[in-house]
Amino acid sequence: MNIFLLILSIIGILLALFLGLLLYRVFLRYSTEIDSPNGISSLEEIRLGGVKQWIFIRGIDQNNPVLVILHGGPGAPIPGISSARKLDKELIKYFTVVHWDQRGTGKSYNREIPVESLNLDRFVEDLSELIEFLRLRFSTQKVFIVAHSGGTLIGLRTACKYPEKIHAYVGIAQQLNIYEQERVSYDFILKEAIKTGDVSKQEAIKAIGLPPYDSYKKINEKAKYIDSYRGFVYNQPLKVMGTLVTNFLTSPEYSLKEGINTLRNKGYSFTQNAMWEEIKNIKLNKEIQSIKVPIYFFEGKYDMTVPTVLVEEFFDQLVAEKGKKLIIFENSAHFPMLEEKKRYEELLIDVVLKGGS
């Protein structure tokens, strides 16, 4: 009888949690409605490169400049469609913000997507097609691009290939050279483990070994040590990670299945398995010497996932015809747009959009 009551109690708790989740999704949808005569809040399925993909467009005035946000990974929709309602409250006053869950991940996850189409050239063309779609839709010549982490590989290459379509490019935690990135972060975590005298961590880190790695899973193993030394999230880590994780389940734009699949890293694994051989050999710092659009780098001082020192070196050598700025977020690691959200918004509005200093 006691076991029966326990089972009933567990079922009751699970049902209550499920109901609470559904109610919160309804609350979030209505509390973030855009009440503006020329506003837009539209979840849309479009075809890019022949593959169905999802975008979420939000803004209080469709005459505002268009800003496309590229999530990380590739294959990790952070910040993706699921983040839009919570993260863009200020930005939608000044931009028409477009979140895109890239092919193979988040709301655009589909195992039927041809594996051979998961490559950077195809992602660049997907983005180019998306920009064309938005230029026609909103009668604008150029759009702003804001990319984070793995999304910066796509964003920077697109800005170099199609400068005529892009008003300005912002790279947050800009990836450039995966081998160098992993070498610097490996040295960091090993030195921290030695500094703290943690022998077991030292042995575990040495077992991972130096790059190059034959699988993205080695990077995942390293990530937990980077995180433990605050090189992933420096400022309010529990709050930041809690927000990112819960977004997948609470977003009205995601079905529960889509949210759970994302939390289980289905899209990330699918994409990384297909792209790892290409990604591990990327050397944008050697490939790109100049750029024809205004370019900004937003870098967390303590970021050891994508070490800021590598971006500083690239910034110094980059020839930027229309100007370049490197902005360090003094209280952030890999997620300055979350760790110092207010400053991030102010910089996008006052510096990138309005051309301030």
Question: Where are these predicted regions, by residue range?
Answer:
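The serine-hydrolase catalytic nucleophile loop
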Residues: P77-L87
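Conserved alpha/beta-hydrolase
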Residues: E90-Y109
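A catalytic-pocket lid/entrance helix-loop region that shapes and gates access to the active site
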Residues: I166-P212
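Conserved hydrolase catalytic core segment
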Residues: T140-R183
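Short beta-strand/loop motif that positions the catalytic acidic residue
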Residues: I291, F297-E299, D303
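Catalytic histidine-centered segment of alpha/beta-hydrolase-like enzymes
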Residues: S332-K341, E345
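Alpha/beta-hydrolase
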Residues: T196-K286, V293
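Conserved acidic catalytic loop of the alpha/beta-hydrolase fold
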Residues: R122-K142
